[in-house]
Regions:
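TPR-repeat structural position
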Residues: 17-18, 58-59, 65
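Alpha-helical solenoid repeat scaffolds, predominantly canonical TPR units
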Residues: 23-24, 45, 64, 71
Length: 122
């Protein structure tokens, strides 16, 4: 896996979502593969949803996560060395928790855990 992507994964997993987005912006500008650009844009959107959630905007976060989930299928089960299937599961769990919270079925609005990016062995 490319060193820049590994660094970006570290940023994401440490909750540094704005820096993660910046790292992906620089990677997107250097790739010519449209599928790779689309994947990085998808990951940036996931990070933006998590930023919205950290700001307390559950409704926008829910909408953005739902949109990202619908676009994730074309990159399953792995893409560029990342376990997309595991990320999708994390996002589905988070989306379910957000929906339960908004429906009043869950007392705690904060997620039990945030999605993580997992690097697969080569």
């Amino acid at each position: 896996m490319h060193a820049a992507l590994l660094k970006a994964v570290e940023l994401f997993n440490n909750g540094r979502f704005a820096e993660f987005q910046d790292a992906l912006d620089s990677m997107t500008s250097t790739t010519r593969a449209s599928s790779e650009r689309q994947f990085y844009t998808l990951l940036k959107n996931v990070a933006e949803a998590l930023l919205q959630l950290s700001d307390g905007d559950e409704q926008d976060a829910e909408g953005m996560l739902g949109s990202a989930l619908r676009k994730m299928d074309e990159f399953m089960p792995r893409f560029r060395g990342l376990n997309v299937a595991a990320l999708r599961e994390d996002m589905q769990r988070l989306l379910g928790e957000l929906r339960e919270s908004r429906a009043g079925k869950r007392a705690e609005p904060a997620p039990s855990r945030l999605p993580r990016l997992r690097v697969l062995p080569e």
